[in-house]
Amino acid sequence: MQIKGYSNKEMSRIALGTHLGDVSDEVSALYRNAIKYAVQNGIYSIDGAINYRGMRSEKDEGIAIRELIESGIVKREDIFVTSKAGLLFGDITERLNPKMYLENILMPQGIAESDFFEYDGLKQTLNPAFYEIALNKSLENLNLETLDLHYIHIPEITSAGMDETVFYDEMEKLFAWYEGKVTENKIRNYGIALEFMGEEPEDAKWHFEFEELKRRADKVSDGESHLKYVIFEYNILCPYPRTVLSQHVNGEALTLADACLKLGLKTVASMPLAMGDALKEHSLKELLEFALDGCENIVVGSKNTDHIKELLSFL
């Protein structure tokens, strides 16, 4: 039975990421313990995606959340849960890789291989029917009735493969679908999860304007859209979302981060430690302070309770 309710809080300043690690039982056990420790000690936001670790991360989140709630340690409203969809995914516990999942599960439900655009091994789609399947599966994995936030995952892949106007039209259709999910109480808010735009803001193939996306979201919601968050890589080695004037709002050239803020979209920094690379020359304190100074929230991936203890000192 799915747990009812949703968070009564905004995303915590630091959220726990769940993308790292292999699909083994050992890693899953570490994640479950890490999630429970983090939530009980102030990092109450958990960032995930249906494709992380072949769905195992979401399933681990679901087990940890249920154990916390059923034991009375926390209530549903104390936890902020995030997921993402858009990339082709598999189900490792059912021994289905993404190709097999497409053929055996998605295609019988009307999803076609031609719905996806591909880049560097990642297949991405904006087809609302795919998101319907993915969202329902995420809610099942997480044992939840409502997600606090659901992201469109790496839409740059699709935008790079189609005409700009067609891309905005497809995003508008997807926004309309999302607004319907808010009405159905399946999500509270939605957002955009970027990969390449943050890393390579001057590369035209990854470019689209957030002002136009916000306009399209407002259009399908009578000006009351639930498009609220944008997540992108931001760290000392990738400062571009706050240094490169890559967006425009009311004719003014702005950085990605400043454009989001001007449009009323909350900014979330992913990979604040640059996958550990930045720790070679900078302290954890330097890196977290840099990311927190530049964005309203950050996501730090960890399955290690000792690492989480270090993070807690920055809350």
Go through each PLM region and give its residues.
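An active-site-proximal structural segment forming one wall of the substrate-binding cleft
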Residues: K123-T146
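N-terminal amphipathic alpha-helix/helix-capping segment at the start of soluble metabolic enzymes
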Residues: M1-G17, R76
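Short helix-capping segments at alpha-helix termini
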Residues: E67-E77, L142, V182-K186, V220-S225
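Short, solvent-exposed beta-strand-terminating loops
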Residues: I79, S83-M100
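Active-site-adjacent "subsite" loops/lids of carbohydrate-active enzymes
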Residues: E94-A129
